[in-house]
Amino acid sequence: MVEGKGFLVSSVTELHRKEKQKKKGKSGGFESLNLGPNVFNAIKKKGYKVPTPIQRKTMPLILSGVDVVAMARTGSGKTAAFLIPMLEKLKQHVPQGGVRALILSPTRDLAEQTLKFTKELGKFTDLRVSLLVGGDSMEDQFEELTKGPDVIIATPGRLMHLLSEVDDMTLRTVEYVVFDEADSLFGMGFAEQLHQILTQLSENRQTLLFSATLPSALAEFAKAGLREPQLVRLDVENKISPDLKLSFLTVRPEEKYSALLYLVREHISSDQQTLIFVSTKHHVEFVNSLFKLENIEPSVCYGDMDQDARKIHVSRFRARKTMLLIVTDIAARGIDIPLLDNVINWDFPPRPKIFVHRVGRAARAGRTGCAYSFVTPEDMPYMLDLHLFLSKPVRPAPTEDEVLKNMEEVMTKTSQAIDSGVTVYGRFPQKTIDLIFNRTREMIDSSAELDSLERTSTKAFRLYSKTKPSPSKESIRRAKDLPREGLHPIFRSIIETGELEAMSFFQKIKNFRPKQTILEAEGEVAKSKHVKGPAGQWVDVMKKKRAIHEEIINTRHQQNQKTSNNHLEMEAEPTTSFVDGTVEGSKVSGKKRKAQETFKDDEFFISSIPVNHHSEAGLSLRGNEGFGSNRLDAAVLDLVADDGQGIKQQQSNYHWDKKGKKYIKLNNGDRVTASGKIKTESGAKATAKKTGIYKRWQERSHKKVSRDSGDADETTRMSGRGGRDGKRRQGSVPNAHVRSEIKDLDQVRKERQQKANKVSYLQSKRGGRGGRGGARGGRGGGARGGRGGSRDFGGGGRDFGSSSDRGGRSGGRDFGGRRGGASTSSRGGKRGGGRGGGGKRGRGR
């Protein structure tokens, strides 16, 4: 009975425990994933309570072992979505287990950010993580590999370099592979590196692809070796955070610096952190110098920057010691600023994907943020392409005349449109910009450094513009028909009614176009002065003709306006009006007007273009060149480089190898110097083949990277012979690094040879420095005649003279005579010893 009662109690306890687990599972927290205590405690320590939508969708799939391709907007928690399952799968360090997880990142900064996050989530585990990125010492990375890491976080270029240098390094044990920012990795920029890395991975691996911009067509990722992958795409409609406010500000190219100073000084609060994107590193240097003259201390970051300097600048910005960070696209795709308030696109991004990655830095984790984009007249087509990609309508801000007619009604309608998701673009306050522009121009002209930097940045931007993808033809056409914009709504609060009237008056002066030609004006003057001639008659004829033509033009204009309004009302979606390209008040040609008047049955009409065509085209890897261009055969990076040299190097180059008599394909950013060396992206020169740096480090440190990546204290010591035939692995012993006293055959032979050479040298030193004699006699004694000897044994060779057919040049003072040594031959040399005595010319030394 007791046993039965105990069994009953244990069953009830087990039942209660299972019920508690079910309740926790229904809560939607991390408890429902049944994570181990080490990982779960680290998550709680980090402060996470509920998974984000992308984590809730992907983590159960990853834990089940299937391949996953996931897309979610920037700042949605994608990094934790693949790190938490990785830590749960690996659990703990396995000696002699090799590398079990590999995370590839396109940039060094993103890899460092992932490493920091991995250490925080894996703080309660003993897993070993190594970072392999460019810019760091190769010897230090060899040392990291000898410690037997379980997880490697790397960039493709450096990992490929290490694989080529270290023969014993293998990735066959990798069972968990993550491609972070997969669209950049699988773009044409890293094709060669990834091809070599993927060939060394095991086929029995789990592959994960994560990015903020991924296409739905997984055929573009065939290189990754996906096996029945699960596609998870969140926020496809809202590619940017709904808490992010977008402001598009039109400006002339020469006024962009003035507009930036005004925005930073007057509009953005001094306690808010702002990220400023520019096109090239030359613009970074110019804007940085300009800000310093204005007593503004920014931080900078660009691709060619030294790694240590980059870390210092970014860390100062993260510590809020500086409130501005000026960056390029190349450098910024890994910088994670958790509390960023504003993003300024000083140069409008040429691709919608780049815009999403830029503005995604702000408004993270439930915070609000603002994104300001400067739009020049040349950038208007790119802005329209962007809104096609975002599926958002766009309209100009109301003009000053419209605001003055009914300010309250116009402002209310504009605010309602912005709240409903419509993008409103407008101008800066021109009067304020003009004042700042004049002062900025004086500063640049008075400073030789600023003037030089401005000219350099202008040339760099000209080259940058040549490499930009072109917008779609439809957007170019629509941009020409867009009506004039007014002052942007964000500046309404600082503009008074009197200033609005002045701005309206100035705008009317700018838009004034006289109706009369110069000939008519002269005719009017002649008519007023009562000058006789045909001029007055011409004026009357032109007035009658213009009156008739104006009536016809106004009638046709009203008809076109009615047709355009009816067409816009028939459209179901607000963005389709931009696809058709009709703008209210625009003139339409006959063919286009006829096409607009055709009836389209909403019930039976099937469009040849998908509804999400523009969105998928912008996400596609093949669409990296933009909406308006075809795919190029040349390998072009997703991001345009930030300097002129980098722009030229973004195409794959081939170098003729004279020794191998074949072409060698160089990686992007590499070039061959006159000495046959490759100059890598970091600026370091390296030979085209294996450099041997690993072997030199191996000889110096007496360590090695074993094929199974064992522990450093057990397998990396290379003491003497290392056991029988090098197969028996011994533990750490005292003085294991000391060189063995047992010499092998080569060492004994080398030592004997050195000893024999030493004896020979000493003998020759004693007998007159050796001999160059022989068949022709030397200068002194020795077996073959030497150059000369000592005073007593100068000719001390065979028979105390020269044993050659020709006597030596000089002998000693006692044995050979002063004027020549004795010759044992019947023929005495002319310069050596004679037949019986001294030579004719030989003179003893």
From Swiss-Prot:
Keyword field contains Translocase: no
Feature: compositional bias, Basic and acidic residues: 696-716, 738-754, 806-817
InterPro entries, alphabetized: DBP10_C, DDX54/DBP10_DEAD-box_helicase, DEAD/DEAH_box_helicase_dom, DEAD_box_RNA_helicase, Helicase_ATP-bd, Helicase_C-like, P-loop_NTPase, RNA_helicase_DEAD_Q_motif
Domain Helicase C-terminal: 256-411
Biased composition (Basic residues): 828-845
SUPFAM superfamilies: P-loop containing nucleoside triphosphate hydrolases
Record protein name field: Putative DEAD-box ATP-dependent RNA helicase 29
Species, as recorded: Arabidopsis thaliana
